[in-house]
Amino acid sequence: MSCTRETGGAAPTRGQKILAATLRGSLSVLLKPAFLSRSPVALQRHWLAALSRTTLPARGVPRRRTVLGPVPVELTGNGHSGTVLYLHGGGYVSGAPVTHRALTSHLAKLADASVAVADYRLAPEHPFPAALDDAHRAYLALLEKGHAPERLAVAGDSAGGGLTLALLQRLRDEGQPLPACALMFSPWVDLTLAETPPTVPGEAMLNRQWLMFAAEAYAGNQRDSAGASPLLGNLDGLPPLLIQTGSDEILANDSERLAEALDGADCDARYQRYPGRWHVFQLHAGMLHDADLALAECRDFLHRHWR
């Protein structure tokens, strides 16, 4: 099989151009300085949570706290089409269900789905493979609760995108029932940073120094293991994948390399690149038209594969 490559997004209106420039500038000024290796992890977590309040969760989407096995989750939406296990980003050292409510609530509403956002353990307090173990336990708990795998999906952004891929590989290797499909937004799939550029024009959030810090905090000397860097693992026999990334982000190369690797794998995959968009721009759903279009693509992908 091969990985189908597509260009996402639509020609922006003048208003959308102004909005995009404003959002990009806000990220560069307010968020990027917090993602410095010398910033205390507690500050990074607090700052990310505070800035997430500037996003717009979908209206009328219920949420409640519950658990899947031993893993706390925030259950978003109560749709009946299927269930998504969502693994948030944050470099394995920050992020939480609250920081990703805009993305997860709009996804739940669009797809008529329930989205279970795992509040997995973070590094450096809980290094590799704690996050992967929690994702694994949460997925198995969904199966134990009677969720049919053909009505399940796994999704994640950034570190959570890499975690999504690593979880699929572990489930496949164990012979566990695989979900119907998976979504990955700007996935971080190679923690060795062997081919990560120093920077890219227009990068609004991340920098290589912080990625090095986060990779070391999470995986230490195991950064080249498939569980931490799933790009280096076996990609055969995985469920259908949808990968979305922006052109203006330092991790775009991870998605490009993943698409190339999937060309030679026994896996059906689609890779959508959104020109002029930044890292996990889908977090601006409800404001940015391209974010809404991207999540509509996710809805269609889920409905195509859920049975």
Predicted regions and their residues:
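A glycine/proline-hinged amphipathic helix-loop "lid/cap" segment
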Residues: 1-76, 307
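Alpha/beta-hydrolase superfamily serine-hydrolase fold, recognizing
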Residues: 26, 65, 69-74, 78-307
